[in-house]
């Protein structure tokens, strides 16, 4: 290891050492001089050990040393000077190679023999004392330089980080240095982990801003003692009065071994929501490492355990105080914007926009004052919002007919439980792509084998199998042809076919997707986007990409194989699923969507055909995986391209007003509805698109009897929140996982559905 801060004996230090040597050459050495010699000897030993360690390190690595000899010259020189100094103090040796030999006798001034010299004793004594002080000063100076050479790293900056747009969050303070964080990605990872432990965030930290909204692009721009704002999922900077006066809830300073701590969970095991990453945790959060909270703060534990036990996603209706008829607004409350009572007031303030400013008072429809967080998540779902103005309890809490009609229209979808279905039962839409039902796969494979007339070898068998697909065996990439054996066709679409293949060594089945580029003219960017997105994904409920090979005519993707087929075929066979089976599937789908959305990726084509299922021996679904990322893309701004499958398309896509991640939630709501009753909520005669699109845009649907008579209110509430026409109040993918029905806590409830 190269010593960058080499030791240098300056001229004043050397002169003081020489003076101490001449003073110590008198016959009468003082006790102070002896002590100085002792200190100098100890210092010499320290420097010798340092030089030895340096030489050993240099034998292993000389990468950054242009001149090893020159790099050692200064420490060696200092070492020689200290050796000479030590010899002088003990009465022998010479001081300094470059300064010539200086013996102890020649450095003293004594009177001739027999001559009386008054005061000579005092002179020698004072010189000895001065020399001792000089030696002590010199050794202290050198010790300081030795210490500095051993600690070349600079002190880490202590920096506070806030959550973007959260004016109540007190922030976290962590040390930041180039030694601790080699890149922004490692800093983002730690900030994401720390924020998830204290507040609900919509995804991973992706951007850091200073307090005026300037984007930080390099670690060197972070200044010691300053504050910065963390943004998730490419959010724009929100200029609010951040809580700079409050102390953090807990000391969240990272320990030096935080990167390798056994208490730190991997990202896949640290869901912001219990089901985010496909694992159902208990309702009460279990602190990492045992009893106390992960950051050791009792206050932190009590605050967030209250939030987790009280807060669940729901949409509330707000009546803005003002001239009648008053404005009525809807607001989605969840664990991300409602961790405390003050946070809810802030969220209400931002949507109602009172003339008097900040919302100070909230009342229920019956006039009861809302004083605590749990009041927003009880039986009441309509609230009056006031500022500092006076409340007239007699007139203000009386709804006009126009206001009552508006509230009833909002509740309409929750009042259709007793509606009888008129006419025949609606049907499922036609499958949007060709696929072979599971029962026909075996027959198809047998027919192909018989038609091949018992091929002489495996190569001929594979050639016969590919013949109908238009793909020649010789065209297959060597990496696929040499490592996998081809099996039956398990599906095809407009641009691709899918074959079942097996690993020649392990026998593990996979799926081979062959995309015909000639059929994708002008749409090649979709193929590139699919591969690019899938390479980023690693999740238990998302199909894994194992290998991709790009050729001039075809793109070959080796994918994870799921034996149960797709969900569309499963629905066709059983017609409808129980609530418990539907809960399993929506958990897995919500987990996959939450993972995608945390990375800023929207799927854009969620439908039963793109959901693959694993079945147990009794035909029950035990696992669901999301597949086919041909339309997936990263969202950095509103999207306007009209795409997807008609039955599952969200209204904002049809209206072409711009859309984002929540179109996936709409599609998942349609699927959940289908799972429970066997048909979609929006239908049109003969699957005509225009009437279907009109129905989707209207947002009006029902839960008709007898198909919904045995289905509970909890899942109806979840569907109603997933199928909100306004994307601002529609559930997020995390809200799906946080909903009490999804978590199996239907005793919590969410209001009265009989109104």
UniProtKB/Swiss-Prot annotation:
SMART domains: DCX (SM00537), S_TKc (SM00220). Belongs to the protein kinase superfamily. CAMK Ser/Thr protein kinase family. CaMK subfamily. ATP binds at residues 490-498, 513. PANTHER family: SERINE/THREONINE-PROTEIN KINASE. Keywords: ATP-binding, Kinase, Nucleotide-binding, Phosphoprotein, Repeat, Serine/threonine-protein kinase, Transferase. The active site is at 605 (proton acceptor). It comes from the Eukaryota. InterPro entries: Doublecortin_dom, Doublecortin_dom_sf, Kinase-like_dom_sf, Prot_kinase_dom, Ser/Thr_kinase_AS. Transmembrane segments: none annotated. GO terms for biological process: intracellular signal transduction. Residues 18-128 are annotated as: Disordered. Disulfide bonds: none annotated. Residues 18-52, 100-128 have a biased composition (Low complexity). Residues 53-66, 74-84 have a biased composition (Basic and acidic residues). Its EC number is 2.7.11.1. This is Serine/threonine-protein kinase GA29083. It is an enzyme of class 2 (transferase). Gene3D superfamilies: Doublecortin domain, Transferase(Phosphotransferase) domain 1. Residues 157-243, 314-397 form the Doublecortin domain. It catalyses: L-seryl-[protein] + ATP = O-phospho-L-seryl-[protein] + ADP + H(+); L-threonyl-[protein] + ATP = O-phospho-L-threonyl-[protein] + ADP + H(+). Residues 87-99 have a biased composition (Polar residues). Residues 484-742 form the Protein kinase domain. SUPFAM superfamilies: Doublecortin (DC), Protein kinase-like (PK-like). One of its GO terms (molecular function) is ATP binding.
